[in-house]
A protein has these predicted regions:
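Nucleic-acid enzyme cleavage-core boundary/entry regions
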Residues: 1-265, 272-389
Length: 389
């Protein structure tokens, strides 16, 4: 039986089983390939027993995640949504999921990767005998890939699918990136562009003398720190995620912290979005709750911007951005997260922002001086160990 299902899945993807045999698969590729094949085996087994083939997709929602107080990150619960072949409302999404599995297997077999956009076109075709296409647009295939991730317990990048690079790093670390040696202290004004796939088989850490990591929210703030050579003066790595950090950035932060024992400090906007970004870096995200152990950094610290900084730093009135009703609602939702609830410093922080009635961006510190954030604010927070946990 396994041989039969394996052939079917491979044929659908357009590759041959010998393709994988011609190259040496890493342990993770072997596991992912095995999980994809097992998915196909289950379909064939159900069909041979004359049962309705189905897939049980773990539910990706807040209601299906739990906070592990011991590990200090969120984990996925046991709730699933069943996707059945012989259910008219589910048949197409069932087909799309197996089609995505087939495409991923083909990529692994051939030792190639593709973008989310590339995968969409790779899987796009007319369904024989109908006027239907396999996918209406890329948003459908993106969602299916996320479903496939949680079903086979593998990151998208382990399915050989990547997103566009977003995020950067500079500092005293030398990497081996796909065989090329990269000195991140010699990357000019733009820094090293953090790729989507940063697993050990792609990115190796050759040498690092940094003492910690400062992660800032936006490229604009990162550029100020880089131009002022903050990373040279304080012997650290400086990273950014272009707003909400993408998977590659979060996975890299996790690896740098776990493997090199580097503390992670976050400098984010004083608004609900900044709080949420910190939550995702520290505890993990709902969509990737099944992989929090490889994505989250439970020891990450929140340096700022803080709700008390308007008065503490004597900022100008012009930096205030009025909190909207949506902002206030979101802040209360975040305060109610199990990993924030009960933490007095965080309750005080969020309450203060709500009382203030305004939010602030890190760039607001420029109203003091263009280099105030790099020369005074962050050095003082680090020296005084003044952060939220």
């Amino acid at each position: 039986m396994p041989k039969k299902s394996s052939r079917k899945l491979t044929a659908a993807g357009g590759a041959t089983t010998s393709a994988a045999a011609k190259r040496r698969l890493g342990d993770r590729d072997k596991k992912t390939l095995g999980d994809l094949t097992n998915l196909a085996d289950g379909v064939v087994a159900a069909a041979e027993k004359k049962k309705d083939p189905h897939l049980d997709i773990p539910t990706r929602s807040l209601s299906n995640v739990k906070y592990n107080k011991t590990k200090r990150f969120i984990e996925m619960g046991s709730n699933t949504n069943r996707r059945q072949l012989f259910n008219l409302s589910q048949a197409k999404s069932y087909m799309q999921t197996l089609l995505a599995a087939s495409g991923s297997k083909r990529l692994i077999d051939e030792g190639k990767t593709t973008s989310l956009r590339g995968l969409f076109y790779m899987l796009l075709h007319d369904i024989e005998g109908t006027k239907e296409k396999t996918f209406g647009d890329q948003s459908e295939s993106d969602t299916v890939i996320e479903d496939l991730e949680v079903t086979v317990n593998a990151l998208r990048e382990e399915l050989h699918v990547y997103a566009s690079n977003r995020g950067g790093m500079v500092g005293p670390i030398t990497l081996i990136d796909s065989g090329d040696e990269i000195d991140c202290a010699r990357m000019g004004s733009g820094g090293y562009s953090i790729p989507s796939i940063v697993e050990p088989n792609v990115i190796e850490f050759k040498k690092c003398t940094a003492k910690f990591i400062l992660h800032v929210e936006k490229d604009t703030v990162w550029r100020r720190f880089n131009e002022d050579k903050f990373w040279v003066k304080h012997n650290c790595l400086l990273t950014h995620g272009g707003g909400q950090p993408p998977r590659g950035v979060r996975r890299l932060l996790n690896r740098l912290h776990t493997e090199l024992k580097l503390p992670v400090y976050c400098l984010l906007d004083n608004d609900p979005w900044g709080y949420y970004i910190y939550s995702v870096i520290k505890q993990g995200s709902i969509n990737l709750a099944f992989e929090s152990q490889r994505m989250a950094v439970p020891d990450a610290k929140y340096l700022g911007l803080r709700s008390i900084d308007y008065e503490r730093c004597e900022l100008a009135d012009g930096v205030k951005i009025t909190l909207s009703d949506t902002d206030a609602k979101r802040a209360r939702q975040i305060a109610d997260y199990p990993w924030f609830k009960g933490k007095k410093p965080w309750e005080k922080e969020i309450d203060q922002m709500l009382k203030n009635g305004f939010k602030m961006e890190v760039e607001s510190l420029i109203s003091k001086d263009i280099s105030y954030v790099t020369e005074q604010y962050v050095p003082a927070r680090l020296k005084e160990k003044d952060w939220l946990d």
